[in-house]
Amino acid sequence: MSEAPRIQLLSPRLANQIAAGEVVERPASVAKELLENSLDAGSRRIDVEVEQGGIKLLRVRDDGRGIPADDLPLALARHATSKIRELEDLERVMSLGFRGEALASISSVARLTMTSRTADAGEAWQVETEGRDMQPRVQPAAHPVGTSVEVRDLFFNTPARRKFLRAEKTEFDHLQEVIKRLALARFDVAFHLRHNGKTIFALHEARDELARARRVGAVCGQAFLEQALPIEVERNGLHLWGWVGLPTFSRSQPDLQYFYVNGRMVRDKLVAHAVRQAYRDVLYNGRHPTFVLFFEVDPAVVDVNVHPTKHEVRFRDSRMVHDFLYGTLHRALGEVRPDDQLAPPGATSLTEPRPTGAAAGEFGPQGEMRLAESVLESPAARVGWSGGSSASGGSSGYSAYTRPEAPPSLAEAGGAYKAYFAPLPAGEAPAALPESAQDIPPLGYALAQLKGIYILAENAHGLVLVDMHAAHERITYERLKVAMASEGLRGQPLLVPESIAVSEREADCAEEHSSWFQRLGFELQRLGPESLAIRQIPALLKQAEATQLVRDVIADLLEYGTSDRIQAHLNELLGTMACHGAVRANRRLTLPEMNALLRDMEITERSGQCNHGRPTWTQLGLDELDKLFLRGR
């Protein structure tokens, strides 16, 4: 029998190369670490030069504070940093880097040259090291105030790692994405990128709102900026601001999602869950929302030392953060109206800050959003479009549409589907649109109906096309939600209680949240350490659905501290009712009926999408129509 291998210390070089496996995955990983060091050094301009996707050369140059000559060799040592001293510093760290591992890991798998000069030094100093030679060589050099780090021949001494690198273009795309993320995190810093001698982009400092919006457009594309809703909300020490894309501007991949916590880019499952919930019934199946959001919170309540790449964070009160993010985004999306979507591109974000519905959310003593009030707020409580002179008996000849003062009951809403258009106020569209654009409602006035499916309307911008069924489906759905919220969820006791086996941890969770389940129509009773009984379920649910739903909800509560599955399931049922009850294709409408539907869309939450996330209307501007007919050439 062979002797068991003995335990021994690894050499510093091998230990650093193993550590590099966590920190240095590809050239983009190197760029991230070097750029974060430059930002932590107070740089105002960072130049990045790349050759062969960063595999042959990656040079980062900044104008930061620089590193004293005596500290240069120490900067390449493991666990050497200027950013923290005590454990208490780690609990409130605001710098992007703090572990002191990056340069040591990089220098162990590449040829590294670092040149730096401080403001009070007469000359610059340079240190060189290679993967096989961990003894750095320091010598004088010429360099302005700041630091340059040059990384050549990445993985030259670890062929096994090098062969896993992708093609040059792929590696450069990853590297460019890292720079974009940091450019969005720090608007006050200029970024310049060159690849193989060609300038890719030059982003100047952005210190005012206009310049910040321009940078967002440069990084994310002008189309995103034109289809984004600016938001800013602060509540109970939590501050969220940035841009959220309209549901109609979604992507097939989650590749336009930037979320920052105290200036640090993160990809956190709690954040992702809150965002998914907010977009739940306005996003088409399989599509992903777009956003650039900045979340600021006391650093003492967030732990950034969770993952080697620092992409994950842990919040001390995760439920409060989740509810704040969800409530803010849900309200902001719910406040979007056709006139918001018809505003000139970027006009809202480039002028004065706009008030959003998210700012009106109310939080209880524990910081929880009262979702029943904020999410299911009645559209009937809003003041509809007045239409200027036309609403007050002016020249348009069209009387403004008036919603009922109180929302209908669930039974009334359910039974009134086919009679929806009967009580609508009569009135004809004006023969000609009012001269003033302010007197024209956002969706304009109906002109005709096409194939019994689409409504054609004229507004101040051109032609509006409305999917009649999809629009009515959303209006009916929102009315049903309002009715359910006002009446409450009626519970239905089970003749024979349903017993379900769970773990002790799950049973504890259900018992802890029993009052929460009760508000949603469930009554749960603990029978034993690992057993629950369902005694009552919401009247709209079937018993078989309820059993699995309780299991899923408990799993969510354990994972996120909250769950929207019950509400989502009920909303799905209401959505089905609304879909079946909405006006069908080939239903001929009169002009007054079409105009009444347009007015209703203008005051209904999320009227831009049906319950399944499909758009309900689109705008064809005069410029687009002119292009179709080659006018103006």
From Swiss-Prot:
Database matches in Gene3D superfamilies: 3.30.230.10, Histidine kinase-like ATPase, C-terminal domain, MutL, C-terminal domain, dimerisation subdomain, MutL, C-terminal domain, regulatory subdomain
Keywords assigned by UniProt, alphabetized: DNA damage, DNA repair
Region: Disordered, residue numbers: 337-364, 383-405
Biased composition (Gly residues): 385-396
Primary role: This protein is involved in the repair of mismatches in DNA. It is required for dam-dependent methyl-directed DNA mismatch repair. May act as a 'molecular matchmaker', a protein that promotes the formation of a stable complex between two or more DNA-binding proteins in an ATP-dependent manner without itself being part of a final effector complex.
HAMAP family given in the database record: DNA_mis_repair
Name of the featured protein: DNA mismatch repair protein MutL
Lineage, opening ranks: Bacteria, Pseudomonadati, Pseudomonadota, Gammaproteobacteria, Pseudomonadales
Gene: mutL
